[in-house]
Regions:
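Hydrophobic anchor at the beta1->P-loop junction of P-loop NTPases
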Residues: 4-6
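ATP-binding Walker
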Residues: 11-12
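Walker A/P-loop
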Residues: 15
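N-terminal phosphate/diphosphate-binding loop that engages ATP/GTP or pyrophosphate donors
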Residues: 23-81
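Small-molecule kinase domains that catalyze NTP-dependent phosphoryl transfer to phosphate-bearing small molecules
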Residues: 60-64, 103-109, 117, 122, ...
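Glycine-rich phosphate-binding loops of nucleotide-dependent enzymes
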Residues: 130-133, 137-139, 144-147, 187, ...
Length: 208
């Protein structure tokens, strides 16, 4: 078994590339951010603070789908409202510790491509391969804006840009597990190369 850690800020393209990479390698893809979104969704729907239900909630991840207490919530967690709430919840140490342990358990059962913001630094510091994807904030905001429009959501580019800058600040400055490039991680600027070139670079690194 082996593990691939992919970190980077919101909108850097890590989810897209992680899915493609896992498919090419025929191993499990794990979107850790989706787990935080699932916690955020449950908190929103129940009105209960995460610390009061975190040890009782069931989160499963298989076939690229996220299940919350047995329900497929893959689509319900992909909104800007849930994204913002997940960012706030991710600062909670108890929530982070719970999900990190769950993510590590997954990696011990099978080979994984795991993506998030603290995979190479906290979740899987001994990962066999580490990558850090990034792009200019305006490039990432444009991607996020286009995603929202494609899903039929109302969005204004300037507001998306402001929200993304806030998200970056929160991710990079939180006390627990801030977003940083892991030691030994290969840096890739996803604004400068195509998706195919990014995938090839990762595959060449892993396959030698």
């Amino acid at each position: 078994m082996y593990s691939v850690a992919i970190d980077g800020p919101s909108g850097s393209g890590k989810s897209t590339i992680a899915k493609l990479l896992a498919d090419k390698l025929n191993i499990t893809y794990v979107d850790t951010g989706a787990m935080y979104r699932a916690i955020a969704l449950h908190s929103k729907e129940t009105g209960i603070e995460p610390v009061d239900f975190i040890s009782e909630v069931e989160i499963d991840y298989h076939d690229d789908k996220v299940f919350l207490n047995g329900e497929d919530v893959s689509d319900k967690i992909r909104t800007e409202e849930i994204s913002k709430l997940a960012s706030k919840i991710s600062k909670n140490l108890k929530v982070r510790e719970f999900l990190v342990q769950k993510q590590r358990k997954i990696s011990k059962k099978r080979s994984v491509v795991m993506e998030g913001r603290d995979i190479g630094t906290v979740v899987l510091p001994e990962a066999d391969y580490k990558f850090y994807l990034d792009a200019g904030v305006e490039v990432r905001a444009k991607r996020r804006y286009n995603q929202l429009i494609e899903k039929g959501e109302k969005a204004e580019f300037e507001q998306v840009l402001i929200d993304l800058k806030d998200r970056d600040f929160n991710d990079m400055n939180r006390e627990n597990s801030p977003l940083v490039k892991a030691e030994g991680a290969i840096f890739i600027d996803s604004a400068d190369i195509t998706l195919e070139e990014t995938l090839d670079k990762m595959l060449n690194t892993i396959r030698g």
